[in-house]
């Protein structure tokens, strides 16, 4: 699994030649792909890319602030370790050019909810009983997020936890700029 530092280090090397994205895509779980497929894989994982004369550029570093989509995310989990805990709620709003444009909210089915988590979040087992499967909620969240700039109060935790849970559920990790 790529760490936030690995992703950030890579994203700070842009612009890069198109073929330089192949090793990163392989490490992120896409396998060894041709450059065009590696670009599409990374775009699908949330990296906002544009291409000029064989060089890849991050749109998030060239877009004006008015053209940037900020996605403010908050998650709730039933524990702090994504290896043995899961996401139980995802909430997010998109903000662009001074306007909130979309929102996203999912409760996620779980058989485990410690009393202290219920007390902190206000979420009950009854709420989670009819929740979505975690994989489905995470896939829907990725589609909502697209290549938006991932923002959160506890960004390292939220981003890492969601990315790990995506991989655990057979999805590719998040690679969005944070």
Task: Tell what function each PLM region has.
Residues 1-68:
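N-terminal accessory regions of nucleic-acid-interacting proteins
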Residues 24, 177-178:
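A generic structural signal for ordered secondary structure
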Residues 57-59, 68-176:
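Conserved non-catalytic scaffold segment of RNase H-like nuclease domains
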């Amino acid at each position: 699994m790529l760490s936030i530092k690995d992703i950030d280090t890579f994203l700070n090397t842009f612009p890069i030649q198109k073929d330089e994205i192949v090793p990163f895509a392989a490490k992120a779980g896409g396998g060894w792909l041709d450059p065009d497929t590696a670009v599409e894989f990374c775009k699908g994982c949330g990296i906002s890319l544009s291409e000029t004369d064989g060089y890849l550029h991050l749109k998030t570093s060239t877009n004006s602030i008015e053209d940037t989509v900020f996605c403010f995310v908050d998650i709730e989990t039933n524990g702090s370790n994504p290896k043995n805990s899961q996401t139980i709620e995802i909430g997010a709003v998109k903000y662009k050019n001074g306007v909130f444009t979309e929102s996203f909210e999912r409760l996620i089915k779980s058989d485990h909810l410690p009393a202290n988590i219920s007390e902190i979040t206000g979420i009950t087992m009854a709420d989670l009983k009819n929740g979505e499967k975690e994989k489905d909620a995470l896939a829907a969240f990725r589609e909502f997020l697209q290549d938006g700039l991932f923002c959160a109060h506890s960004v390292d935790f939220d981003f890492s936890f969601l990315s790990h849970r995506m991989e655990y559920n057979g999805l590719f990790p998040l690679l969005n700029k944070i």
